[in-house]
């Protein structure tokens, strides 16, 4: 996604980045990950540090269905604040 204004968070802390490529493949960091494994990985990260922030980047060609899969997986892990990452135009 692209935004007119992009803000870099001041508090970096522990962060996980989930990416969805144009084929709908989900990655946690650089590792491909099925939605059920994503839930377990995010749950584990939150148990280790509840302040963990999770960012979602999706290719412009990724479908809404794949974004919903990630949203469901992170919600099932107990995450209540998924941050959508954008690139400034």
What are these regions (language model features)?
Residues 34-48:
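Periplasmic peptidoglycan-binding/anchoring modules of Gram-negative envelope and division proteins
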Residues 32-33, 61:
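Short, surface-exposed acidic/glycine-rich loop or hinge patches that mediate macromolecular interfaces
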Residues 1-32, 50, 80-89:
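Extracytoplasmic juxtamembrane/flexible linker immediately downstream
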Residues 16-19, 36-39, 73-77:
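Short, low-complexity, polar/charged sequence segments that are solvent-exposed and flexible
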Residues 47-61:
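Short, surface-exposed beta-strand segments enriched in small/polar/acidic residues
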Residues 1-3, 41, 45, 70:
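Amphipathic alpha-helical segments that mediate coupling or scaffolding at interfaces
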Residues 60-85:
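Amphipathic alpha-helical interaction surfaces in cytosolic regulatory modules
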């Amino acid at each position: 996604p692209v935004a007119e204004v992009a803000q870099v968070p001041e508090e970096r802390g522990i962060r996980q980045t989930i990416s969805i490529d144009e084929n709908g493949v989900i990655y946690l960091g650089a590792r491909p990950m099925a939605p059920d494994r994503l839930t377990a990985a995010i749950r584990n990260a939150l148990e280790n540090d509840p302040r963990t922030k999770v960012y979602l980047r999706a290719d412009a060609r990724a479908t809404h269905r794949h974004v919903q899969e990630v949203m469901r997986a992170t919600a099932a892990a107990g995450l209540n604040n998924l941050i959508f990452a954008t690139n400034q135009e």
